[in-house]
Amino acid sequence: MPNPLYRQHIISISDLSREQLECLLQTALKLKAHPRGDLLEGKLIGSCFFEPSTRTRLSFETAVQCLGGKVIGFSDGANTSAKKGETLADTARIISGYTDAIIQRHPKDGAARVAAEFSRVPVINAGDGTNQHPSQTLLDLVTIYETQGRLDKLKIAMAGDLKYGRTVHSLCQALKRWGCEFAFVSPPSLAMPDYITEELDEAGCRYRILGSLEEAAEWADILYMTRVQRERFDEQEFAKIQGKFNLEASMLARAKPNLRVLHPLPRVDEIHPDVDATPHAYYFEQATNGVYARMAILSLVLNEEV
C-alpha cells in the first residue's frame, strides 16, 4: 500500500484523514513491537524549539537517534537569530537548507503553518501556542488503543484547562473520526472552545458537561487530565482557578475496571501522587509511547515505504 504521508507536513490533526491516522497508529505499534534502526540512516533532522519542552523534544530526538538519524537544533528561541528580529519564514528557509525535516515548537498559534509555507522540507508541528499538537495526539491514540483494544465509540472525559490545552483540541479532532462520545469537566472560564464543540456537532458526536471528576471517572473509558497552564495567566487569574479540578485516588472508587487516566504531562497538583499506585494510572506509559509515535511520524514522512 502506498505511504499516504510521504513528504507531507504534519501541522494539524484536522489536515489528516482517518486513513493517514490509522497508518500512523499501526506504524507506531509495529515499531514498538519490532524496532528498526535504519529508517533515518543518512538523514539530518532540525529540532527547533522556541518554547520550553522536556518530553516532546527529548522523545523526538530519541526517536531520530533510534531510527539511525542525526539531530541539530536548539531548545530555546532566545539563543537564535529570532532574538535579533529574524522572521519565522526566513528561519524556516535557512534550516530547511540544512536538514531533511524540521521539528518545530513555537509559542505562537499558526507558527507551524508559516514554517511549512516557506520550508523546502517537511515540517512537523511539535506544538504551536494553544493551537495544535499532532504528535501528542498520535501518542494518545496509541495509548488509548493499547489500553482499550479499539478506538471506536469510546467514552472520553477531558478535565482541567480545556480552553488553552492544545492536546485536548487535537484529540477531539482525531477521535471524532471514530464516533467517540465526550464529557468535559472544567471551570467555565476554561471550557472547551466553541469551534471544537461545533466540529463534534458536525461529526454527529455527542458530548456533555459534567460537574465533577467523580462523575467523569464513573462514566468514562478514558479520563484525560490536563494542567492549568500557569504561564498563560497572570497571577490573579491563576489564583482563581488553581486546584479547582484535582484528581485523587478516592475519586476513582466507582470507576470501571478498564478506565485509564491519561495526562500529557507535566503535572503539578491536578493528579495527586496517590493515583499513581492505582490500576487506572497510565500517564507514564503514555509518555513512553511518545518515542514510538514520533518514530512513526518521522519514518513515514521521510520514507516511501516503511
UniProtKB/Swiss-Prot annotation:
Annotated metabolic or biological route of this protein: Pyrimidine metabolism; UMP biosynthesis via de novo pathway; (S)-dihydroorotate from bicarbonate: step 2/3
Alphabetical UniProt keywords: Pyrimidine biosynthesis, Transferase
Pfam families: OTCace, OTCace_N
GO cellular component terms, A-Z: cytosol
Any single GO BP term: amino acid metabolic process
EC id: 2.1.3.2
Catalytic activity line of the entry: carbamoyl phosphate + L-aspartate = N-carbamoyl-L-aspartate + phosphate + H(+)
Function of the protein: Catalyzes the condensation of carbamoyl phosphate and aspartate to form carbamoyl aspartate and inorganic phosphate, the committed step in the de novo pyrimidine nucleotide biosynthesis pathway.
Name of the featured protein: Aspartate carbamoyltransferase catalytic subunit
